[in-house]
Amino acid sequence: MRGDRSDRLMKKEIFNLNRHLPSRRKTLEELLREDRPHVTGADGTRHRFKWAELEDLRGMLTEDEARRLRLPIYIEIESETSGARIAGDIEVKVVSEVLERDDEGDEIYIYRPEMRVLRARFPTVTQYMFLVREL
């Protein structure tokens, strides 16, 4: 009984940590057409993207990839692991290039020092997403 209550509280806290995440992500192509590129978080806050980051990102991708890449790129932090996961073939391509690693397909695992490098280059293009596995 006690475990059920603490599990529910943990899930609620994780939900609260993720309230900043957008209810709808936009493609890089869409954002480049906006005067003030942004997405709206589920909590109603606006997350603005810096032009320099969007242009830097655009230079790394083909036209087709710019049409398909949805932003922000999520850095998935899980409760049971020490690193983070980034999913999606285009997202992995970007992260691999920034970190000077081989492209690993459709997901990549990174650790704290690599997160700092990624966030230093793309602070507005990336966002943390907190996950908790079934307890």
From Swiss-Prot:
User: Tell me, what's a Pfam family for it?
Assistant: DUF61
Leader sequence range is: none
Q: Which NCBIfam families match?
A: PRK04115.1
Give the family this protein belongs to, as stated in its UniProt record. Belongs to the UPF0216 family.
Q: What protein name applies here? A: UPF0216 protein MTH_949
Q: Which organism is it from?
A: Methanothermobacter thermautotrophicus (strain ATCC 29096 / DSM 1053 / JCM 10044 / NBRC 100330 / Delta H)
